[in-house]
Design a protein with these regions (language model features):
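Conserved beta/loop motifs at nucleotide-recognition and modification sites
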Residues: 1-192
Length: 192
């Protein structure tokens, strides 16, 4: 099921979470926003036990899936994040890490109810011909960040300013967008 960033933030705020989230897109600011939202689910004192992050360029997929299958320790839920899920693309990098996507397919069919598995694919496109991609797009909550338009960026700037109790004129926002080459990461760091 396709979602927006606001949908994901509402899921987290209301604690009405799906068992699996697939996050796709190249905008680092938006990826960081999603990551922060999921990290905030686990209290600081429980993060060592109930928050795990795995980089797929260094760790086999099976290790992350096994961790997702384990129940939370002294907490209500566990969050497992899979970073750089290049096996969902057509990319075939030179790496010694071997991934068995069958493990993820089996997990997606029967996820652990107390675990939230978040898969980050920081790519423009996924290989929709792959069985695992088709299954995740059907079973997981799917958030894809497409190319942001100037209108999207301006709207996000206005929202951010409003949240902080500020306003900015249209021409000033347009100038900020132009001077930062529409880089949302740079814009948001300037606004902070």
């Amino acid at each position: 099921m396709a979602l927006t960033l606001r949908d994901v933030q509402q899921d987290v705020a209301k604690q009405t979470l799906k068992p699996i989230y697939l996050i796709q897109g190249t905008d680092q600011y938006l990826l960081d926003q999603v990551r922060s939202a999921f990290v905030s689910l686990i209290p600081d004192e429980d993060r060592t036990l109930n928050l795990a992050q795995f980089d797929m360029r260094e760790t086999p997929l099976g290790v992350a899936v096994d961790d997702a299958r384990s129940v939370p320790f002294f907490g209500d839920r566990r969050v497992v994040m899979i970073d750089d899920a290049y096996f969902l693309t057509g990319e075939n990098p030179r790496t010694k890490v071997e991934h068995h996507v069958e493990d993820l397919i089996a997990y997606a069919e029967h996820p652990e109810p107390q675990t939230v598995l978040v898969i980050f694919a920081p790519y423009e496109k996924l290989d929709s011909r792959k069985k695992v991609v088709k299954l995740l797009k059907e079973q997981a909550a799917y958030l894809a960040f497409g190319d942001l338009t100037e209108k999207d960026v301006r709207s996000m700037i206005t929202d951010k300013l409003r949240q902080n109790g500020f306003e900015m004129s249209g021409p000033a926002i347009q100038l900020l967008v132009r001077l930062t080459n529409m880089s949302l990461t740079q814009i948001m760091s300037e606004l902070d």
